[in-house]
Structure formats: C-alpha cells, structure tokens
C-alpha cells in the first residue's frame, strides 16, 4: 500500500476564536481494478505485481484499515469491470456484489463500464449499495437516467467534503451502440462549475474530484486539462491510464495553485492511502 501525508490549508474557523486541533482524514483510493477477483498470477515475472491485488484481498485489507481508522474514506475511480472471465460470464454482477462489501464512499464510470451497453450498466448499477458519480455525462432519455449522481457531500470527522466525478470522452473508447443517447460535457468546464458550487454555495471544507480522464493522456482532455481549467479542487483521485504514482503528482489549477493527484496502476496491486491534515 502506498502512503502519503499532505496538508491542506482550509479556513476552518472557530466561532469561539479558540484554537482547535487539526482535523485529519484518511483516504484510500483504487482505480482500474478490472475484474481482478483473485490476486495476480504468483508466477508473473514482474515481482512487483505477482500475487498482489484482487477484490477478495481488498475486502480483508479494508476491514483491517477500518479497525485502525474507523472514519476512513474509500473511493474508486472506475473501470472496475472487464479483464477476467467473471465479467464475461456474469457481466459485472460479481464485481458489484464484492464492492458492496467494501464500504465504498463513491466510485465513477470508466469506459469499460459501457462494455455490455447501457441496459446492462443500468441493471447492475441498481444493485450497488454505494454512490456512482458522474458529473459530465448527461444520461437524460436513456435507461441510465437518474441512476448516477453528479456530486455528493460527505461529513466525516467534523469535515464537510464535496465529491464529484469526471469521465472520459466516449469517442474512440466506447462503441457507439453502447453509449447511444449519452451526452458528453467538457470536464474542465464541468469541474470548474461543480467545484465552485461545492466550495462557495455548499460551503464544503474540501473538494475531491474522482477522475477517469487519465494522466498525460494522448486524448487531450486529461487530468491536467481538467485541473488547469478549474479551481476549488483540493484532491484528484485519478484513473484510466493505469499510471503508477509512487508519490503524488501535482498540477497547477487556473489560479496557479498546485492540486494533488493520485493514481495507482491497475488491478489494485497498490492502494493509495492519503493522510490529510486540515488546518
């Protein structure tokens, strides 16, 4: 498990004027777990990946982490489907069933969630006991209408956290028949509007963007594009490009302020663990 410690300076003002102890959040993050129900082949030549990951092992790890940090947050950045015979045979039901045991605070939609079409996506997503966020797809008029949420607010350890999600352009990634009627919206514009609303109108102390845009993607509208065209985002939990970040990356927003970004390769070989101190 990777581990980061970073400090976010936010205006958590005490009305009494008395100094308060810093608030702390523990955040776990996975991305692109790709139906890896069991750990990766132990005979794999790449010893960094061999016999690691897997949905079942992650359930056990999360239970252990919650014993140490009962208030932890856990987010996933999409593409939890596609990559094993379990998905081919059961079309996502196995993955959703196991994710229901993980206490997910939210996930989002990756391009592979479209692989069996909107009807299957709607059917399986209705079985989820966790929020599935997507802010820049408009599902109006499709079977997916009303199933996802554009954003949520979580209150944890005295901190008000706004969470939203941005997903990739479907052209070139998703078959036209599998996303018919879905409208894609510019992630930079949507991120700016949503993060500003969460910070200024909803008065969130922290704003997290769950992203499946990718890091250094050759498609243009990636995490860097989204960050530099927005403000009010404190943390980006990324996915899609299977980028392994041994340390957090940073990219400046439209005001020149660095935004923290995490991504963890694929198959939950690594789980990002962030300890956030809010002053």
Where are these regions (language model features)?
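A periodicity- and composition-biased signal for non-globular, repetitive helical segments
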Residues: 8-9, 64
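Intrinsically disordered, low-complexity segments enriched in small/polar residues
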Residues: 1-2, 182
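Sec-dependent signal peptide recognition
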Residues: 2-8
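Hydrophobic h-region of N-terminal signal peptides that target proteins for export
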Residues: 9-17
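Acidic, metal/ion-coordinating pockets
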Residues: 19-279
């Amino acid at each position: 498990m990777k581990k980061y410690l970073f400090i976010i300076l936010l205006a958590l003002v005490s009305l009494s004027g008395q100094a308060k102890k810093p608030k702390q959040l523990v955040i776990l993050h996975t991305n692109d777990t790709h139906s890896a129900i069991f750990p990766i082949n132990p005979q794999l030549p790449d010893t960094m990946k061999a016999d690691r990951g897997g949905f079942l092992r992650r359930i056990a790890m999360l239970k252990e982490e919650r014993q140490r940090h009962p208030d932890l947050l856990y987010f996933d950045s999409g593409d939890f489907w596609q990559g094993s015979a379990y998905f081919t045979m059961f079309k996502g039901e196995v993955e959703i069933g196991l994710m229901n045991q993980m206490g997910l605070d939210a996930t989002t939609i990756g391009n592979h969630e479209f692989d069996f079409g909107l009807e299957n996506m709607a059917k399986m997503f209705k079985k989820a006991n966790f929020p599935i966020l997507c802010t820049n797809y408009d599902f109006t008029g499709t079977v997916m209408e009303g199933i996802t949420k554009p954003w949520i607010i979580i209150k944890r350890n005295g901190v008000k956290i706004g969470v939203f999600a941005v997903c990739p352009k479907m052209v070139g990634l998703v078959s036209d028949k599998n996303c018919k009627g879905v409208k894609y919206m510019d992630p930079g514009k949507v991120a700016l509007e949503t993060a500003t609303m969460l910070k200024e109108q909803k008065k969130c102390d922290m704003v997290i963007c769950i992203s499946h845009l990718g890091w250094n993607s050759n498609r243009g509208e990636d995490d860097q594009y989204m960050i530099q065209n927005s403000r009010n985002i404190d943390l980006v939990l990324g996915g899609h490009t299977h980028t392994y970040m041994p340390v957090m990356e940073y990219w400046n927003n439209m005001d020149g302020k660095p935004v923290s970004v995490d991504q963890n390769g694929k198959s939950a070989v690594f789980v990002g663990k962030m300890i956030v101190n809010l002053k």
